[in-house]
Swiss-Prot record:
Part of the 30S ribosomal subunit. Belongs to the universal ribosomal protein uS12 family. It is found in: Plastid, Chloroplast. Pfam families: Ribosom_S12_S23. InterPro entries: NA-bd_OB-fold, Ribosomal_uS12, Ribosomal_uS12_bac. The lineage of its organism: Eukaryota, Viridiplantae, Streptophyta, Embryophyta, Tracheophyta. PROSITE patterns: RIBOSOMAL_S12. GO terms for molecular function: rRNA binding; structural constituent of ribosome. One of its GO terms (biological process) is translation. With S4 and S5 plays an important role in translational accuracy. Located at the interface of the 30S and 50S subunits. This is Small ribosomal subunit protein uS12cz/uS12cy. Signal peptide: none annotated. It comes from the Eukaryota.
Length: 123
């Protein structure tokens, strides 16, 4: 607990909030180019081959982004839109690729939760 004299000498510093997605630089999404598309395994107790992409963003950052949904068409040099949002069982993956925009097509035959996977309403 500081004394009044100490508080006069230097005031309390406001708490700085640390962003969970620094590579986006305060933007809701960022465009980037895939440099590598590959699979990684989640941490215990889960088991799978999760699809991820290494993306070089327009902000200059090189990040690892998760590719949601079943099946994708991404390869090296694909241009993608990246949003924030981590994947809990993949350490170091703090971003998601937005499906249905730029080079990332929507998930095929998706009926429910279509808006999250870039799928138009079926006729």
């Amino acid at each position: 607990m500081p004394t009044i004299k100490q508080l006069i000498r230097n005031t309390r510093q406001p708490m700085r909030n640390v962003t969970k997605s620094p590579a986006l630089r305060g933007c809701p999404q960022r465009r980037g180019t895939c440099t590598r598309v590959y699979t990684i395994t989640p941490k215990k107790p889960n088991s799978a081959l999760r699809k991820v992409a290494r993306v070089r963003l327009t902000s200059g950052f090189e990040i690892t982004a998760y590719i949601p949904g079943i099946g994708h068409n991404l390869q090296e040099h694909s241009v993608v839109l990246v949003r924030g949002g981590r994947v809990k069982d993949l350490p170091g993956v703090r971003y998601h690729i937005v499906r249905g925009t730029l080079d990332a097509v929507g998930v095929k035959d998706r009926q429910q939760g279509r808006s999250k996977y870039g799928v138009k309403k079926p006729k």
